[in-house]
């Protein structure tokens, strides 16, 4: 909106809502003697070799039904006011300021049913309910043999596993899903009718798990507000300076649970709802310089500050305390955002025949990066917001801000050109190439639990945290990325063949070096083609993604064994697009 000839106002308001409902049933079968040798520390290829696959020794051991429902609503508005000025032919620019506010509401509700129908009466009831599947085993009712019904009657003999992972791995037989769902509903309906051991309340066949159905529920609200002021100045025709600052304020309020493990967690939840408020604000200055001494040379410099906020799931006020093994499931509500100071410098050359070539250097210094150091001994409960009686307990997975600064450095080379000067149809050729190389160094803190015993007399035992670190690359950061695109534009036709190649990526940290993970190198080819048709606004397009069907693979550091392999395959989109 133009208020005056040199004063402009704009703004927007948006609202959104997202729901995600999940209904998952797990049916568990167990084989006590599944392998011909120990499977500990063995890769998946070796697992396939030592598996017995003896269905006569596989038994039904229960099920789990999880229902989770999440909801997130967001409302955002933004207002910007801009004033353009020109004090002289050598000094002009604009002043701009504005505000943005975003409010989020989140909720999560989980319910969990499970059952362990391993008692004779329960299984006998199941056999009689589904005689078409278990007729040959009904005669076992009243004997101990009924608890060892093999996998055969559960098998879905019409299931076709097809070729899994290019035939490298055998999936084996699968249980009949329809039968298993019917068994689930049968025991859910007859949860207390098929068990002779009614003296123990937990011995019923089917239970609604009180603890897991309440403990992980949460709801909360986040308010984000940002105000900024910037000035964009042109000093003559060659120099542009843009500077300013953004003030960010973030407040969160989340409700979760503090609980103690009861003797029978499935029947009794020992916990109370708790509410936690947190607030932080930051001033984030920035500076951008652009100098263009001649028409074919462009020099840029930028100094900025950015934040990486912790995942909301990591700052819930959740505590679950188990007295049996003196352990705590713990979320750190005091984690702060990680802050990055960024420096970017680039120089670009532009010539009408050669095209555009640029070289860039970037640096990032990240403080307060969020990490997990593994287990931690509670030597002083006040450090973690815990009560005094929890001294000596163990936090299972302790996340906090990294006290060491993370350093990331890199170079970027970019080339873009169009061969417009070639004769005839060759003038439509297009070439784009980009190469980025980075190096990073991160000190990942590592906590070892040290036990010291003085046999005295008197006997004295002491437990302590030994904090150290190991050095590795920044997580999720490849050392090299290469993009190349070859295209052709002629009249109403446009096509691009592109390739993306990146080196291995450090994917997962871990206390144990053997469990840290990296990806394999990755190369992917894509094709995009479109043709304008002789109807105004109509075009036909073809997109082929992952032409060579590249595979994502993660591997453990030391053994080179696969930890994850994902086949996304090739996708082809063919269609029409109409613009009006």
Label every model-predicted segment:
Residues 1, 9, 93-99, 241-245, ...:
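Transmembrane beta-strands of outer-membrane beta-barrel proteins
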